[in-house]
């Protein structure tokens, strides 16, 4: 009976041990390795054909190492004012997150955030271009 209980507890603990640790994207823009740019048309949050190759590269970089996670940073320039641009940046990030999850990347390995030219000098300088989502695959801890 005791052995069965221990086996059961071990099985229940397995998924908890496999979960990705919480992470944040503060400073992700400063990293230079495993950074991918996914383009969008002006005013759009729909993925186009040009997104296919960088999305494949993101999935390859994430691989099966559950310690690797991705910061998905949506950008929008001055496309309709501050509120509209931050909303568009968030929609773009969410679109990429949904597409990656749809291709099998667990959502707990993805974090999407919006970046706005009003709050980010890098976006204001158009590096990366303001009509992109930047995906930064973080190194495993």
Predicted regions and their residues:
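Periplasmic OmpA-like peptidoglycan-binding domain that tethers envelope proteins to the cell wall
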Residues: 75-141
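N-terminal signal peptide c-region/cleavage motif recognized by signal peptidases
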Residues: 13-15
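Sec-dependent signal peptide recognition
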Residues: 1-8
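Periplasmic peptidoglycan-binding/tethering modules of Gram-negative envelope proteins
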Residues: 17-68, 126, 139-141
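Short loop/turn segments at strand-loop or loop-helix junctions that form parts
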Residues: 40, 72-75
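Short beta-strand/loop motifs in extracellular/secreted proteins, especially
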Residues: 68-70, 108
